[in-house]
């Protein structure tokens, strides 16, 4: 699918709450200039759950047009409704997405058997590579190792984004999955240990404002240069902590504003950071000296 750092793109909005496609294109070009290896549209960071179907399609079409095949474009198509997920994933395939990322059904809190049935139904309905997305802190349900192994047998299910935060689970997962099945880290503070376990990259929030640094970290790990990787990961930790000091994507949108990308406020029910939180984020960003170059 890809190796290295992929960015879970933030979605820019105007002051009146509409999509800001000019800023979105600018964000994409900055990512590509920094050698980011993939782009995710309409995921958690992209506020996919508060986008209309028309907005999602517009963003995806824009990303596909701007990237022009330079890197894979992965569509965040997961919902907690199987029929809607199938329809959204079919739309992504029709528009030309390179893959679809499917979060576990949230709120419903289905069983492992239900997860197998849900993801299999989607995979059967589309001719598109599918990435499973495990983020139980946000969804209330986790994919077990056994379920992942079962789903990996489906030819269209080709990748797994692991964001449980459990390094032991990551080890069990990598041991159990077949060779060649792509696994990606989903937590910026765990890029080093997850890639040490064999993840072939990261789908990152951090890389929105810090694409070059995130890609440099991933490249060091792919090259087994753990001395460089430890330095980069360590130096980035205060920034990562600040970017997750509030619910994603609240801080990362503030960070993008700080570097000159007017991505606007998150959509309700999310709101901007508190003054104290924002001040801490900006202080941390200004203290960070960078590790690239």
Swiss-Prot record:
Its EC number is 4.3.3.7. Pyruvate binds at residues 45, 203. Gene3D superfamilies: Aldolase class I. Keywords: Amino-acid biosynthesis, Cytoplasm, Diaminopimelate biosynthesis, Lyase, Lysine biosynthesis, Schiff base. It is found in: Cytoplasm. The keyword Iron-sulfur does not apply. InterPro entries: Aldolase_TIM, DapA, DapA-like, Schiff_base-form_aldolases_AS, Schiff_base-form_aldolases_CS. It is an enzyme of class 4 (lyase). Signal peptide: none annotated. It catalyses: L-aspartate 4-semialdehyde + pyruvate = (2S,4S)-4-hydroxy-2,3,4,5-tetrahydrodipicolinate + H2O + H(+). The active site is at residues 133, 161. Pfam families: DHDPS. The keyword Lyase applies. One of its GO terms (molecular function) is 4-hydroxy-tetrahydrodipicolinate synthase activity. GO terms for cellular component: cytosol. Pathway: Amino-acid biosynthesis; L-lysine biosynthesis via DAP pathway; (S)-tetrahydrodipicolinate from L-aspartate: step 3/4. Disulfide bonds: none annotated. The record marks 44, 107 as: Part of a proton relay during catalysis. GO terms for biological process: diaminopimelate biosynthetic process; lysine biosynthetic process via diaminopimelate. Belongs to the DapA family. Catalyzes the condensation of (S)-aspartate-beta-semialdehyde [(S)-ASA] and pyruvate to 4-hydroxy-tetrahydrodipicolinate (HTPA). Homotetramer; dimer of dimers. This is 4-hydroxy-tetrahydrodipicolinate synthase. It comes from Exiguobacterium sibiricum (strain DSM 17290 / CCUG 55495 / CIP 109462 / JCM 13490 / 255-15).
């Amino acid at each position: 699918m890809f190796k290295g750092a992929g960015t879970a793109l933030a979605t820019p909005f105007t002051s009146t709450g509409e999509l800001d496609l000019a800023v979105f294109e600018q964000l994409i070009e900055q990512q590509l200039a920094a050698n980011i290896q993939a782009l995710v549209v309409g995921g958690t960071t992209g506020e996919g759950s508060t986008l209309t179907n028309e907005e999602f399609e517009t963003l995806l079409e824009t990303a596909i047009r701007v990237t022009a095949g330079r890197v894979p474009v992965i569509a965040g198509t997961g919902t907690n409704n199987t029929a809607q997920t199938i329809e959204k994933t079919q739309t992504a395939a029709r528009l030309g997405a390179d893959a679809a990322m499917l979060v576990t059904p949230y709120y419903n809190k289905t069983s492992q058997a239900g997860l197998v049935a849900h993801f299999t139904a989607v995979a059967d309905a589309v001719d598109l590579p599918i990435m499973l997305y495990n983020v139980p802190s946000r969804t209330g349900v986790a994919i077990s190792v056994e379920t992942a192994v079962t789903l990996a047998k489906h030819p269209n299910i080709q990748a797994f984004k692991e964001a449980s935060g459990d390094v032991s689970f990551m080890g069990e997962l990598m041991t159990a999955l077949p060779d060649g099945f792509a696994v990606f880290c989903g937590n910026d503070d765990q890029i080093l240990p997850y890639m040490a376990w064999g993840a072939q990259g990261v789908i990152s929030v951090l890389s929105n404002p810090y694409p070059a640094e995130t890609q440099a970290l991933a490249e060091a790990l792919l090259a087994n240069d753990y001395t460089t990787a430890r330095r980069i990961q360590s130096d980035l930790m205060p920034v990562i902590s600040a970017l997750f000091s509030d619910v994603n994507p609240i801080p990362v949108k503030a960070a993008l504003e700080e570097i000159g990308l007017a991505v606007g406020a998150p959509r309700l029910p999310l709101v901007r950071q508190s003054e104290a939180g924002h001040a801490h984020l900006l202080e941390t960003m200004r203290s960070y000296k960078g590790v690239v170059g």
